[in-house]
Amino acid sequence: VLSPADKKNVKAAWDKVGGHAGEYGAEALERMFLSFPTTKTYFPHFNLSHGSDQVKGHGKKVADALTLAVGHVDDMPQALSKLSDLHAHKLRVDPVNFKLLSHCLLVTLAAHLPAEFTPAVHASLDKFLASVSTVLTSKYR
């Protein structure tokens, strides 16, 4: 459960991401594909090379979903319901992959926002991404 301080930290950090959200989303995906090659199996139709338009496009989708979640932090299940359905019923993504991407997102944010990425912000973002992952996997059952 996100505390009021966590919500404040997440919103402040995401505000700092600003117009770079899509770029950071794509970078996190690239990190995931390089660090955890088995995740590539969900994207057989993508050009997964560095800077590909498909990775950039999906990175933007990831970032847009996170922006939506930040904006609806008190009602993520409702806000992310369609995305949860998509991943559970159509794409059938193994839930562990959300944890892998979350880790890569944290690394990406730490690299780009070193001054803002305090231990408290790190903990809040980690809890937030875990909450998003829980919502996205809630319809698997």
From Swiss-Prot:
Protein name per its UniProtKB record: Hemoglobin subunit alpha-1/2
Residues with PTM Phosphotyrosine: Y24
Tissue: Red blood cells.
Positions bound to O2: H58
Segments forming domain Globin: 1-141
UniProt xrefs under PANTHER family: HEMOGLOBIN FAMILY MEMBER (PTHR11442), HEMOGLOBIN SUBUNIT ALPHA (PTHR11442:SF48)
Entry-annotated residues carrying Phosphothreonine: T108, T134, T137
PTM annotation (Phosphoserine): residues: S3, S35, S49, S102, S124, S131, S138
Superkingdom assignment: Eukaryota
Residues recorded as bearing N6-succinyllysine in the entry: K7, K11, K16, K40
Species of origin: Mandrillus sphinx (Mandrill)
InterPro entries named in the record: Globin, Globin-like_sf, Globin/Proto, Hemoglobin_a-typ, Hemoglobin_oxygen_transport, Hemoglobin_pi
